[in-house]
């Protein structure tokens, strides 16, 4: 089944990883103190931006990749009760290889 949203140009739709709820020592982190995660899973990838000659620049990620992205990159969107992040390829920092 394909994802119901199709990103444009060099945009990527990411499902953010869950924020940590507990510290390594076992302390519970309240919701208002949780930091937004900077990683998630790629759900959909746009076709890529066009270069000066009009050719598509291939994307570096694919659906299913786990990625790290910049702290202030992307736009949070809500669609059908779910929260997603739409980021530009330029806001991606790395693919997680585990």
Swiss-Prot record:
Keywords: Chaperone, Cytoplasm. PROSITE patterns: CHAPERONINS_CPN10. GO terms for cellular component: cytoplasm. Pfam families: Cpn10. Its main location: cytoplasm. Heptamer of 7 subunits arranged in a ring. Interacts with the chaperonin GroEL. Together with the chaperonin GroEL, plays an essential role in assisting protein folding. The GroEL-GroES system forms a nano-cage that allows encapsulation of the non-native substrate proteins and provides a physical environment optimized to promote and accelerate protein folding. GroES binds to the apical surface of the GroEL ring, thereby capping the opening of the GroEL channel. Belongs to the GroES chaperonin family. This is Co-chaperonin GroES. It comes from Bifidobacterium animalis subsp. lactis (strain AD011). The lineage of its organism: Bacteria, Bacillati, Actinomycetota, Actinomycetes, Bifidobacteriales.
């Amino acid at each position: 089944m394909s994802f119901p949203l199709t990103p444009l140009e060099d945009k990527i739709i990411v499902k953010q990883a869950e924020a940590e709820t507990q510290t390594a020592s076992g302390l519970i982190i309240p919701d208002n103190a949780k930091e937004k995660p900077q990683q998630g899973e790629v759900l959909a990838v746009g076709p890529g931006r066009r270069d000066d000659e009009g050719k598509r620049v291939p994307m570096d990620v694919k659906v299913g990749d786990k990625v790290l992205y910049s702290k202030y990159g992307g736009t949070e969107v809500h669609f059908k009760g779910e929260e997603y992040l739409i980021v530009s390829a330029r806001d991606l920092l790395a693919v997680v290889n585990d």
